[in-house]
């Protein structure tokens, strides 16, 4: 089998590339996905409110676990990644957050990455998006990804939580993806007008999958990339339960889009990476790149949970006898409780003046429950997810064998710097202050977790060690740049090799201030134009907020 391009991984970036490259009818593309189709009749991936379900099994989740995390009481921590058409956009929380403009301006400070500034990238965010409120300087009106805004009157807790943040002295922002990210406001979501999850399989592949020049293979587990000298010329994979490899050749390029955990694994199995690691598994060295699998970053978060004094939380929706009605309303009308991910309010703040842009993120949820649906509190409640955004902690992803089915060694080194501990202590104390503003007085009952007895630095640190969880935002393991630990250049091309790019969250040099999905899609759109040799979209002239030493919050 011969194709112009072979794309490994039908996720948030791979589906963008498959769709854009096949717009040229003379370009043939093979898209390989280790998971299955995104079954449209499966409410677990299609109903926004069911977002916890795909994380509980292994049909749609790789369900990786970390090595014992040394600064987290040696816990082995969850590292869920999407499996199936759509990748992690098939199982994520559907929060459409782009990050802060200064994240990208910070990337663009690196020599060779100048065209990754916010104003260079904004046109590609807009190209990908159809926002239900229409287009403007910041938002698109006819892109493949449906973005839904929060509507007034959904749940009184959302507005009360935003108002509480404002009462605590922080800014209000009408659009976390617009002129000003800093502050509290409504949160956009990747949900269609029909109340369905807007994964990249739905948004992108639906328009491309009938094209004769696109071949999609699901249940295709990539074993390794085939090289001729320093040139990538094809891919070998295992289909279904078969142990006999299938191979195809790429006339132009192999595009690795398997995500921050799998992309470095595939490079390592293919002979690209740290020479000592590859020698350990007798993998012939194709090209030494010590940065492959290093620079692993993530967002860590924790929940502050409160009893709700009024019966306005989502607690009744957790009762089995209410679920048939909720399901029917969603299935036939695309409305009701099932049509939202219920992360409809949030915010970004600076915890201290030393941060030039927000370093703490909030997601508000009108029910007290773990992200994966476990440990639901048996009463009306609400919670605040809070975590730091740009931890200095760095980890790694390293293969444990040549077997593509074996999970790698993943270590994030969460909380390995003093800055991490200071940020979490600040975050918990600021959150408590916000939760005790007048706007929440009528709703706020007792603090369920961590509990009022948890007050000292030592007590807060111990709570974080035992209870903080991943926000499922791994990135950085094939970082873009030109230093000795970089893996790809500013166009995603792997250093020292030909015909091979990495295009996914692994190429982010530094983690962004917010959820990763929107930016991963943007990366796919931007590099698709580079691959096609098209001129970049004209740089935006939109304005954006920079704090420039402004006080963190208004004095009361």
From Swiss-Prot:
Protein name: Oxygen-dependent choline dehydrogenase
Compartments where found: Cell membrane
Organismal lineage: Bacteria, Pseudomonadati, Pseudomonadota, Gammaproteobacteria, Enterobacterales
Catalytic activities: choline + A = betaine aldehyde + AH2; betaine aldehyde + NAD(+) + H2O = glycine betaine + NADH + 2 H(+)
GO biological process: glycine betaine biosynthetic process from choline; response to osmotic stress
Any single Gene Ontology cellular-component annotation: membrane
Molecular-function GO terms, alphabetical: betaine-aldehyde dehydrogenase (NAD+) activity; choline dehydrogenase activity; flavin adenine dinucleotide binding
Source organism (scientific name): Escherichia coli (strain K12)
Effect of gene knockout: Cells lacking this gene do not grow at high osmotic strength in the presence of choline, but are able to grow when the medium is supplemented with glycine betaine.
Membrane topology, as annotated: Peripheral membrane protein
Pathway(s) of this molecule: Amine and polyamine biosynthesis; betaine biosynthesis via choline pathway; betaine aldehyde from choline (cytochrome c reductase route): step 1/1
The EC number(s) this enzyme carries: 1.1.99.1, 1.2.1.8
pH dependence: Optimum pH is 7.5 for choline dehydrogenase and is between 7.5 and 9.5 for glycine betaine-aldehyde dehydrogenase.
Residues that bind FAD: 4-33
Active site residues of this protein: 473
InterPro entries on file: BetA (IPR011533), FAD/NAD-bd_sf (IPR036188), GMC_OxRdtase (IPR012132), GMC_OxRdtase_N (IPR000172), GMC_OxRtase_C (IPR007867)
UniProt keyword annotation of Nucleotide-binding present: no
The family this protein is said to belong to: Belongs to the GMC oxidoreductase family.
Induction: By osmotic stress. Choline is required for full expression. Oxygen and choline exert their control via the transacting DNA-binding proteins ArcA and BetI, respectively.
């Amino acid at each position: 089998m011969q194709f112009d391009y072979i794309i490994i991984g039908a996720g948030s970036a791979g589906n963008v590339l498959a769709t854009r490259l096949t717009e040229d009818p003379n370009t043939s593309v093979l898209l390989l996905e280790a998971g299955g189709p995104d079954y449209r009749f499966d409410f677990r991936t299609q109903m926004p409110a069911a977002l916890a379900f795909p994380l509980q099994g292994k049909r749609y989740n790789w369900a990786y676990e970390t090595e014992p995390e040394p600064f987290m009481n040696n816990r082995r921590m969850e590292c869920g990644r999407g499996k199936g058409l759509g990748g992690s956009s098939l199982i994520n929380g559907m929060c459409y957050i782009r990050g802060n403009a200064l994240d990208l301006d910070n990337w663009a400070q690196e020599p060779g990455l100048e065209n990754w500034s916010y104003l260079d990238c904004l046109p590609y965010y807009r190209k990908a998006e159809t926002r239900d409120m229409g287009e403007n300087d910041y938002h698109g009106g006819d892109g493949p990804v449906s973005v839904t805004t929060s509507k007034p009157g959904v749940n009184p807790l959302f507005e009360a939580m935003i108002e509480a943040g404002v009462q605590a002295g922080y800014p209000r922002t009408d659009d976390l993806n617009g002129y000003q990210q800093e502050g509290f406001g409504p949160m956009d979501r990747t949900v269609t007008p029909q109340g369905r999850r807007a994964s990249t399989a739905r948004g992108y592949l639906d328009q491309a999958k009938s094209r004769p020049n696109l071949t999609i293979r699901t249940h295709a587990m990539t074993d390794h990339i085939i090289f001729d000298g320093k040139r990538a010329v094809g891919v070998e994979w295992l289909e279904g339960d078969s142990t006999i490899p299938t191979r195809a050749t790429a006339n132009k390029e192999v595009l690795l889009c398997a995500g921050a955990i799998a992309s470095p694994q595939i490079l390592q199995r293919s002979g690209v990476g740290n020479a000592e690691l590859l020698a350990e598994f007798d993998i012939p060295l194709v090209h030494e790149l010590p940065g492959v699998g290093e620079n692993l970053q993530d967002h860590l978060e924790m929940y502050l949970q409160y009893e709700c004094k009024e019966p306005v939380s989502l607690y009744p929706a957790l009762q089995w006898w209410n679920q048939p009605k909720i399901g029917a309303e969603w299935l036939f009308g695309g409305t009701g409780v099932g049509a939202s991910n219920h992360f409809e309010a949030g915010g970004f703040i600076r915890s201290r003046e030393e941060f030039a842009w927000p370093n703490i993120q909030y997601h508000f949820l009108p029910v007290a429950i773990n992200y994966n649906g476990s440990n639901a509190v048996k009463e009306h409640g609400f919670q605040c997810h809070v975590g730091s955004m740009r931890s200095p902690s760095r980890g790694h992803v390293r293969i444990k064998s040549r077997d593509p089915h074996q999970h790698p060694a993943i270590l994030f080194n969460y909380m390995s710097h003093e800055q991490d501990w200071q940020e979490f202590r600040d975050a918990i104390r600021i959150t408590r202050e916000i939760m005790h503003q007048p706007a929440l007085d009528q709703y706020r009952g007792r603090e369920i977790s961590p509990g009022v007895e948890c007050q000292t630095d030592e007590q807060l640190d111990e709570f974080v060690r035992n209870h903080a969880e991943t926000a499922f935002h791994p990135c950085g393991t094939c970082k873009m740049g030109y230093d000795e630990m970089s893996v790809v250049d500013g166009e995603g091309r792997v250093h020292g090799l030909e015909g091979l790019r990495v295009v996914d969250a692994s190429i982010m040099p530094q983690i962004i201030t917010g959820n990763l999905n929107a930016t991963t899609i943007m990366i796919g759109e931007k590099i698709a134009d580079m691959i096609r040799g098209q001129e970049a979209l004209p740089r935006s002239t939109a304005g954006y907020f920079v704090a420039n030493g402004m006080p963190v919050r208004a004095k009361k």
